[in-house]
Amino acid sequence: MSYTLKISEQDVLGKGKFKNAKGNTECVAFVQQAAGAPVTTCWQRGLKVSEAGPTEISRGTAIATFDENGKYPTDKLGKHAAIYLTHDETAISVLDQWNSQGEVLPRPIWFGRPEGTPRQNDANTFYVIE
């Protein structure tokens, strides 16, 4: 089962709307609160975004990076969660936030990044959260 936005895309925009228990605007807090995703230890790796056809993933679906064991990463190679908008051969368009950004904004995450690019900035590492 995938997780999708429970509110409108417009309603997620704005400073500091999705905070974790420590008051930080982390990516996971956004996906959990806006799409109803459970704690990350319960996340399962679903369809790889780069292998999906243009209509296989619904707009508003929660996506995240996963490691080689199919788990949300705990290593130092990067991790991220976001809300999928669309994708093509060049990038995934998402809504996301991170602590230093402090708010949900749209952005592209590019395919074809060089070796060593952190997962959060490499579209090839994103999968649907199930």
Locations of regions flagged by a protein language model:
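Aromatic- and glycine-rich peptidoglycan recognition patches
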Residues: 3-18, 85-130
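Secreted/periplasmic proteins that engage bacterial cell-wall peptidoglycan
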Residues: 1-80, 87
